[in-house]
Amino acid sequence: MSWLSLLLVTKIAVTGLLVAAPLLLLPKARLEQFTNITTPTALFFRLYGVAITALLVGYAFGIPPAEEGRFPWGVVCMGTVSNGGGAILLLVYSQNNNHRVLAAFFGLIALGLIAAMVLPAGALQKAW
């Protein structure tokens, strides 16, 4: 598995478990408590969960080319914007430590993707 694939798999797994699944499955009251956002229905949270899941599918499409030695520029650019933007917004607007932890995670993913763009040959090397 390449370093880039490892980064993408980590992003998919952690975000899927800690962000997408809760948005799709947790009760509205729990999501409102965690996010400090109140809505008339759970639809807002569910739609956001679907949007995050769609991004995770996009990340998954970057793994096969990376394993074949081709750099998935579109996936990496998408991930840099998504994770970098998310990290900045969470840092600026965060009101609790859970948001800061997510900001750090997204920021590290963005930095990893930027490093991959700077050194694509290194990102495609096998991690083991």
Regions found by a protein language model. Name each.
Residues M117-W128:
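Juxtamembrane boundary at the C-terminal end of a transmembrane helix
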